[in-house]
């Protein structure tokens, strides 16, 4: 009797490789490369008049893959749908089942919170049916966003500027940034003063600094007059120690990472964007080739809001801590953290799958970014099961003429978890103070020096990407799977710009936000959006019907659309010109950003008297494969985009291919993708790499060029093999051969 044939379908080749190693020859593992069905790109694809029925179509460009999967599925006895363990993954599995026409008894759903041999084999032994509540929750979110995007975007085109688009959750995120900017503008600084005295002990050696605290209770010195009055009272008088308080302070470790806290900490400590953090985490989850171990999934699933850890993971951490750091550094029992109310808790917190694989042990198998992020996750998890840090604290009050001054100091007694990991901070901690002499109540001191200083209260800081993610989580806007894309999207749409690592609204963002605030109060309302997330959670839990959620939303939204179109009839909103710090070398004015046929450029506001213009240099992600420098986006004479090293002719690298944020998992070089709309697959251009994709396999759409392009690099591009079209009527897209370093 022939052995049963088993097909396993996952999203990515790397995940397929890792799982295939665990399952063996009786299982064929293939990758769907993400979604194979989706709503159409050219139309809304949702029947608003008949129950919000979606019209799904096969994704363009994946016809051969669909055919391949259909053939493999037809030959298999069982098809295991092993996409990611969340709403999106469940929806992909459902689309696969429908697209491949799989009967219920043949399509089995399996999920892996971590891609390890134990979990993979256990999941295959215990498959389940597709969870249609999860699918419905994903469909509801997808259709909500499609309705808002397809109906609201045309209004923005007509009333503000062509090419604009609107999103449901992104609009709220933009509002948070605009609201913070308005708080900063409206902020009125308040004066206050600090007063420090350096005191010498009387009759004993030693000195210390004391800070003004108040009188009977704490009091702020509001101006210089109040400060000088205190100075007059204490000048020439002795201070007496009135209270000495010594204590032991314990500090417990932070919990293991959730999606939100991982993005925040990676932003603070590694300077990674949320989007980049999730891309690297996905690589670590799906599997990395580790020397001597083969392909291993190194972390648990990275989209989670749970703080839960399995008993097995905590036991493994306990053994590791005791063996490496000693029993005194172990917490003493499983350190269980309480997950916040409202969290879905479907998955564990983010942790390493093999705690014994410490970062240094596998560093040579990881890219720099993989190593840094893995070390962050590994250290945070291990620290969460370690003993508290212990500090000795002392607080001393001294009194003079009815005024109380306070000195404090904190010193570490036992580092505990801090030996492994310390959480980053968005704001600076209070100073721990200088060491203090051994003072007793009744000790006397005299003034050696007085220092007064004026201060002003500061406005709230602009959001960083980390603090915006934190604010979204606290307000219930978005979910772990959407934080990174939201923060990225509002920047891509140029509603928000990052300046000195902080987010500020652009003039365009403020105009769009103003329109939304006036005419779409529900869409832009934080509480309304948070409640919608709760309704989607209810759909996932089987407590609500997804079409009822859509109907309730659309009734109000449709009326807002009608009202807005009527109110804005004949109105065109003007976006203020965006002034830059670039000075026009012709007339000295500050140049402004303009939008032309081929995109944005800098122009002198003195037109028509001054007609000076300049290109805007746009930095791209990734590194030059030739010299490791930054990459810039430039425009050819015909307006086509190409990408070049920031060192220009000194390096000579240029390409029509678009650099991405991804590093090749094999060689670590920046990966590129072909230009064009939609999700393009990234590829490696390093010819020495096993992952290299030849140019003829990249699927170029050729576009005609003329001699001398791109830009000033024409001569170099021809020398490197750039081909010009044989016929002017034949569209040809030049692709420069890579530099010697990339070969």
Positions of the model-derived regions?
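Intrinsically disordered, low-complexity regulatory segments
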Residues: 1-142, 151, 213-214, 228, ...
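Basic, low-complexity terminal or inter-domain segments flanking catalytic cores
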Residues: 2-7, 18, 153, 186, ...
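Structured, non-catalytic alpha/beta "coupling" segments that mediate domain-domain communication
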Residues: 17-40, 171-220, 384-434, 590
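Alpha-helical scaffold elements adjacent to nucleotide-binding pockets in ATP/GTP-utilizing enzyme cores
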Residues: 18-22, 68, 91-99, 119-123, ...
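C-terminal or mid-to-C-terminal helical accessory/interaction module adjacent to the motor/catalytic core
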Residues: 115-197, 247
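Core structural elements
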Residues: 141-151, 169, 199-201, 249-261, ...
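Metal- or metallocofactor-binding catalytic centers and their adjacent structured scaffolds
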Residues: 217-255, 443
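Short helix-coil junctions and helix-kink-helix linkers
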Residues: 261-274, 469-479
């Amino acid at each position: 009797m022939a052995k049963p044939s088993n097909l396993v379908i996952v999203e990515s080749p790397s995940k397929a490789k890792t799982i295939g190693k665990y399952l063996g020859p009786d299982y064929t593992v293939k990758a769907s490369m993400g979604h194979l069905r989706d709503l159409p790109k050219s139309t809304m694809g949702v029947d608003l008049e008949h129950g919000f029925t979606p019209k799904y179509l096969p994704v363009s460009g994946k016809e051969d893959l669909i055919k391949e999967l259909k053939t493999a599925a037809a030959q298999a006895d069982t098809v295991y749908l092993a996409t990611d363990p969340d709403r999106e993954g469940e929806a992909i599995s459902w689309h696969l089942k429908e697209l491949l026409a799989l009967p219920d008894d043949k399509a089995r759903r399996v999920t892996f919170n971590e891609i390890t041999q134990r979990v993979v084999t256990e999941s295959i032994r215990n498959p389940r049916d597709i969870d249609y509540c999860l699918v419905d929750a994903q469909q509801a979110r997808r259709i909500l966003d499609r309705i808002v995007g397809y109906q609201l975007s045309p209004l923005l085109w007509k009333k503000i500027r062509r090419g604009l688009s609107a999103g449901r959750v992104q609009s709220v995120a933009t509002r948070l940034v605009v609201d913070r900017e308005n708080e900063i503008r409206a902020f009125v600084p308040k004066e206050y003063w600090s007063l420090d005295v350096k005191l010498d002990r009387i009759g004993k050696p030693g000195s210390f600094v004391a800070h003004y605290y108040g009188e009977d209770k704490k009091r702020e010195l509001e101006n210089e007059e109040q400060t000088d009055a205190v100075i007059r009272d204490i000048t020439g008088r002795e201070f007496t120690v009135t209270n000495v308080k010594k204590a032991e302070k314990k500090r417990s470790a932070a919990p293991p990472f959730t999606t939100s806290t991982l993005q925040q900490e990676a932003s603070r400590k590694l300077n990674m964007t949320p989007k980049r953090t999730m891309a690297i985490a996905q690589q670590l989850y799906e599997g990395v080739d580790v020397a001597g171990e083969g392909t291993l999934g190194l972390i648990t699933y990275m989209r989670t809001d749970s703080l839960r850890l399995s008993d097995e993971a905590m036991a493994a951490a306990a053994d590791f801590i005791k063996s490496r750091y000693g029993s005194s550094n172990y917490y003493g029992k499983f350190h269980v953290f309480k997950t916040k109310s409202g969290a879905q808790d479907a998955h564990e917190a983010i942790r390493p799958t093999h705690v014994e694989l410490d970062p240094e042990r596998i560093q040579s198998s990881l890219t720099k970014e993989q190593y840094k992020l893995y070390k962050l996750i590994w250290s945070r998890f291990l620290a969460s099961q370690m003993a508290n840090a212990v500090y000795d604290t002392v607080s001393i009050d001294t009194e003079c003429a009815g005024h109380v001054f306070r000195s404090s100091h904190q010193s570490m007694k036992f580092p505990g978890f801090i030996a492994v990991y310390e959480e980053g901070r968005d704001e600076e901690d209070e100073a721990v103070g200088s060491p203090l002499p051994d003072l007793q109540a009744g000790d006397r001191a005299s003034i050696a020096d007085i220092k007064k200083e004026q201060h002003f209260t500061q406005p709230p800081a602009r959001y960083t990407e980390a603090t915006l993610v934190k604010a979204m989580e606290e307000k219930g806007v978005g979910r772990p799977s959407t934080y990174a894309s939201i923060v990225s999207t509002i920047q891509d749409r140029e509603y928000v710009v990052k300046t000195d690592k902080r987010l500020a609204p652009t003039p365009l963002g403020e105009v769009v936000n103003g329109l939304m605030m006036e005419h779409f109060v529900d869409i832009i309302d934080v509480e309304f959006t948070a409640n919608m997330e709760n309704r989607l959670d209810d759909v996932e839990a089987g407590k609500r019907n997804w079409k009822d959620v859509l109907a309730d939303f659309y009734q109000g939204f449709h009326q807002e659309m009608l009202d807005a179109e009527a109110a804005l009839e004949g109105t065109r909103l003007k976006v203020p010109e965006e002034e830059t710090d670039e000075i026009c070398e012709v007339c000295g004015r500050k140049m402004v950003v303009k939008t032309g046929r081929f995109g944005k450029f800098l122009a002198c506001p003195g037109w028509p008297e001054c007609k000076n213009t300049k290109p805007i240099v746009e930095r791209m992600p990734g590194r030059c494969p030739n010299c490791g420098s930054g990459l810039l986006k430039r425009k050819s004479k015909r307006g086509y985009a190409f990408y070049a090293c920031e060192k220009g002719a000194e390096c000579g690298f240029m390409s029509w291919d678009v650099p991405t944020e991804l590093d090749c998992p094999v060689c670590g070089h920046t990966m590129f993708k072909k230009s064009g709309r939609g999700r393009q697959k990234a590829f490696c251009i390093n010819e020495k790499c096993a992952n290299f994709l030849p140019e003829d396999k990249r699927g170029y759409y050729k576009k005609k060029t003329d001699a001398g392009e791109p830009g000033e690099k024409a001569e170099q591009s021809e020398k490197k093999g750039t081909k010009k079209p044989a016929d002017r009527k034949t569209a040809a897209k030049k692709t420069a051969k890579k530099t010697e370093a990339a070969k």
